[in-house]
Amino acid sequence: MPVSRFAVFGHPIAHSLSPRIHTEFGRQMGVALNYLAFDVAPDAFRVSLERFVAEGGCGANVTLPLKEAAFEVCTTLSARARRAGAVNTLSRVDGVWHGENTDGTGLVRNLTERHGLDLRGRRALLLGAGGAARGVAPALLDAGITEMVIVNRSPERADMLCDALGEPGRVSARYWGDLGDLGNFELIVNATSIGNTSDMRTFSLPRSLLDSMTAAVDLNYGSAAVPFLAWAHAVETRYVIDGLGMLVEQAAESFSLWHGRRPDTDPVYTVLHSEYGAPGRS
């Protein structure tokens, strides 16, 4: 049986669970595959991707900080990827790269189906404006978010994301220093990498951001999610959710694009959550 070659590219990448997830999906679905992880800095991404193709690579996932760089290498793009301006799934089609973004679908499926949240009518705060934020923002809007406020330490990037989303009546950008003046939100999504540079003793957000039904969601998982989730628990947020479920769901979407069949995510999520999942409240 021929073995298909896939990979995940990121920087850093040693923490990635994607190889394990896709290997388990392949075993479940009877698909022979070889899935590797490559630690690649942004300036070396294009060359590394060309080498991967030369060695038989036919599909790849892309994580931070390469999602916008992946967008640039694509000859064709899905509507979701084009709207996001970021790519997390690459497929080799007729000798060129086709780009897709499954992050938003993975997040919404995890929140609505696994955690039972109804996103319709919620006011959302999105922290961050990089590749991770770009991937999930369109899907959150499509899921019925009433208003989205984007806050980023570099306000220019928040403005760029607002412009790309093209919904000025629903989406606005504010400064990080304005957080205490924004009112409360039913959904707070951390799409930053702040968990890699902060600890639970120093990370904090204004308590005024919360109401009685707020869901605090970190797109990170494991140690990178600890500071944000620790804050959310400390201020008694109603729902506290890490990014592990989103990771598994977006991986299943990528697997389906490559192999034409969507695996069952619950068995994989259950095992990984027992090992890596942060304590949650949902």
UniProtKB/Swiss-Prot annotation:
State one Pfam family annotation: SDH_C
Single biological process term from Gene Ontology: chorismate biosynthetic process
Residues involved in NADP(+) binding: 128-132, 243
A single MF term (Gene Ontology): shikimate 3-dehydrogenase (NADP+) activity
* The entry's keywords: Amino-acid biosynthesis, Aromatic amino acid biosynthesis, NADP, Oxidoreductase
- Where is it found, in Gene Ontology cellular component terms? cytosol
Complex formation = Homodimer.
Instruction: Tell me what this protein is called.
Output: Shikimate dehydrogenase (NADP(+))
UniProt source species: Xylella fastidiosa (strain 9a5c)
The coding gene here is aroE
